[in-house]
Amino acid sequence: MTKLITTVKEMQHIVKAAKRSGTTIGLIPTMGALHDGHLTMVRESVSTNDITVVSVFVNPLQFGPNEDFDAYPRQIDKDLELVSEVGADIVFHPAVEDMYPGELGIDVKVGPLADVLEGAKRPGHFDGVVTVVNKLFNIVMPDYAYFGKKDAQQLAIVEQMVKDFNHAVEIIGIDIVREADGLAKSSRNVYLTEQERQEAVHLSKSLLLAQALYQDGERQSKVIIDRVTQYLESHISGRIEEVAVYSYPQLVEQHEITGRIFISLAVKFSKARLIDNIIIGAE
C-alpha cells in the first residue's frame, strides 16, 4: 500500500534509512492531477527501483501573476489511489509552508535555456521549476528521476541543472503518452470544451505533418513552420501562440536545420493552453 508522507522531515528520515541499506530510489516529480502519462513514469520507476516516490506539490514559484495557481486541479485522494494501483511506495505531498518556510534568500536564475519558447512567455517559470526540483532532489535523494518529454524544454533544463550542480541522479526522459486519437495527455485537457477536445487532436497531426516534411528532405524551418501553421489555422479555433523549430537539447532557434531538433507547438483554447512537440533528427 502506498504511504502518504506530508512533511519534509519525515521524508528525509525515510530516505536516510533507505540510503543506509543501499536501497535505490526513483522520483517522479508532479503537481498532481495525475493521468496515464504520469503513471507510465511510475511504472518505469517501479520496474527499476526498490522505492518509488511520487511527489505531489503544486509549486507556487512556477506560476506567473496571471496564471492558474488557485484553479490548478488538486485531487490528492484520487492521485494516491492511482499511484497505489501501479505500485508506488510513497506519495510525498508537503504543504507550501513546509517546502518554503520563509522567503528564499537565494534566487535561482536558469539563464539562456529559459529565455526561449515557454520560458519567454512565462518569465520566472523555469526558475521556479529548477528551485523546486533542486529541493526535491535534496530531500528525496533519488538515484533516478523521471520527466516527460512532453515538457521537452523543462527536461533539457533539468538535465543541465543536474550537470551544473553535480546532482547524483540520472534523469530518465519518458516518451509522450497520448490518447487513442493522438492528443498528448495533460492535466489541462479537462478544461477543453467538447468542440475544443475534437479540435485538439490536430496538434499532434500537425507535428506528424512536420515530421513528414523533414523526412522528405525539407530543412528550411520557415517552410515547416508555415505549413504547420496553415494546417492548424484550418483545423482549430484556438489561438496559435507558437510554432517553432529549435535544436535539442541546446534550445537554439534553427533556420537551416542541422542535427537533432524539436518542433514545439502552443495553442490557447478558451480555458486551456496546450503544448506539444516532436523531437526528430540525429543526435
Swiss-Prot record:
Task: Please explain the role this protein plays, according to its UniProt record.
Answer: Catalyzes the condensation of pantoate with beta-alanine in an ATP-dependent reaction via a pantoyl-adenylate intermediate.
UniProt xrefs under HAMAP family = PanC (MF_00158)
Q: Which domain of life is it from?
A: Bacteria
* Gene Ontology biological-process entries: pantothenate biosynthetic process
**Record-listed (R)-pantoate binding positions:** Q62, Q154
Please state where this protein is localized: Cytoplasm
InterPro entries with a match to the protein in the record:
Pantoate_ligase (IPR003721), Pantoate_ligase_C (IPR042176), Rossmann-like_a/b/a_fold (IPR014729)
- Gene3D superfamilies from the UniProt entry: HUPs, Pantoate-beta-alanine ligase, C-terminal domain
Catalytic reaction annotation = (R)-pantoate + beta-alanine + ATP = (R)-pantothenate + AMP + diphosphate + H(+)
Positions binding beta-alanine in this chain are Q62
Instruction: Note the Pfam families from the entry.
Output: Pantoate_ligase
- List the active site: H38
Query: What does the similarity note say?
Result: Belongs to the pantothenate synthetase family.
Question: Keyword annotations for this protein?
Answer: ATP-binding, Cytoplasm, Ligase, Nucleotide-binding, Pantothenate biosynthesis
Q: Which GO terms describe its cellular component?
A: cytosol
Name of the protein described by the UniProt record: Pantothenate synthetase
Question: Which residues make up the binding site for ATP?
Answer: 31-38, 148-151, 177, 185-188
For this protein, the record's SUPFAM superfamilies field holds:
Nucleotidylyl transferase
Q: What is its EC number?
A: 6.3.2.1
Provide the coiled-coil residue spans. Answer: none
Q: Mention one GO molecular function.
A: ATP binding
Entry keyword Signal: no
Q: In which pathway does it act?
A: Cofactor biosynthesis; (R)-pantothenate biosynthesis; (R)-pantothenate from (R)-pantoate and beta-alanine: step 1/1
